[in-house]
Amino acid sequence: MGREVALLVVAAVAGVAPVARAQATGMPSFNAPYRAFQRSELGAVFSFPDGGGTGFEGAYRYASGTLDVGLRGGIFDPPGSGKAVLLAGLEARERVITHTIDFPLDGALVFGAGAGLVSGGSTLFVPVGLSLGRRVNPQGATISIVPYVQPTVGFVAGSGRTSALKFGFGVGADFRLSRVLDARVSGGLGDHPFTGVSIAAVWVH
């Protein structure tokens, strides 16, 4: 059953136009299929979209049963003389697939809503994606790694632009460095200006 769900969702998102911002605030940051924390986590995220500029965000997540909910906010500093953009968003993740002999990956639905707010050019993002991956514990190592992919469909609307559905394909890895510290890296594949990379340091509780 898990394999069929995964294939259906991937097929659905693959049919949408091939450009998307990855998550609720429009930065190229994606999510592993399961949380690293028991109760909550707090992190700092740095994003570097193609085309220039840097995003600085704080992120907080907390657990609610099988669901975890995240808040993120910060600033995107565009290249040149462009105005700084205020970023704010809400994300949620729900585990929907557990690996089996037939399908070796775990999966979670990742969805949210957020905005990039700036005078005369604000943008709304409503992404929905399926994260697929599996935790790897290298023999003899003290760290563990979760490599994953996240195809994502996003509704994008805003001032001075046509509302549209967009598609993106996220690739990432979460590194458990210690019992309380994660390092994370992810990036979006697609057309300019929606590709880029993101790195994060996260304290888990």
Regions found by a protein language model. Give the residues of each.
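Generic detector of solvent-exposed, compositionally biased contiguous segments
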Residues: V5, Q23-F30, P78-R93, A164-G168
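Mid-chain, structured segments of secreted extracytoplasmic proteins
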Residues: D68-L105
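Surface-exposed strand-loop-strand hairpins of Gram-negative outer-membrane beta-barrel proteins
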Residues: V45-G58, I75-D77
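Cleavable N-terminal export/targeting peptides
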Residues: M1-A36
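Short N-terminal amphipathic alpha-helix/helix-capping patch enriched in small hydrophobics
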Residues: G52-F56, L67, L86
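Exposed, low-complexity/repetitive linear segments and helix-based recognition motifs
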Residues: M1-G2, A88, V171, R179
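Outer-membrane beta-barrel transmembrane domain signature
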Residues: T25-A36, E41, P49-G52, S64-T66, ...
